[in-house]
Amino acid sequence: MRKVKIGLALGSGAARGWSHIGVINTLNQMGIDVDIVAGCSIGSLVGSAYACGKLPELESWVRSFSYWDVLRLMDLSWQRGGLLRGERVFNQFRKIMPLADFSHCQMPFGAVATNLSTGRELWLTEGDIHLAVRASCSMPGLMAPVPHNGYWLVDGGVVNPVPISLTRAMGADIGIAAVSYTHLRAHET
């Protein structure tokens, strides 16, 4: 009998997305083995660290944040298509994850970005993982778009904020969606 493959989709959500670290730790404590991970925006950053075996290092870095550390990571830019360049954050990410290729992942991983030319999502599953995460996190207006193969890429949350469809396309039989944004509200009657 074939093992059921479990996919984990880590959604967008800005700083709330750090909660994905807790979701992963809880799944591990419950004995739920994830086979495939996909992420969008902050979910791609956390998901890539998890897929590459670097989640403890990322968690340690995040837990060390002070208010002032967060402010120091903000590198304002008025020229590159976004309020922030994002280089300080992603330089730190590169220190945590020095291996830059999807082939270094211990499990299949994919990131979702949005192609500005077509308005469609782009699934990034091979090549430069740093570029994929940077593109997936590039919130329009806040961070500059990322050039890739003649196109400009921005945050995957524009079109697919919780990429459960990507986990399915990568072979997951069952999908677990981790949602950290608060756009969903209870409807009062």
For the regions a language model picked out, list residue spans one by one.
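Conserved small/polar residues in nucleotide/adenosyl-binding loops
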Residues: 182-189
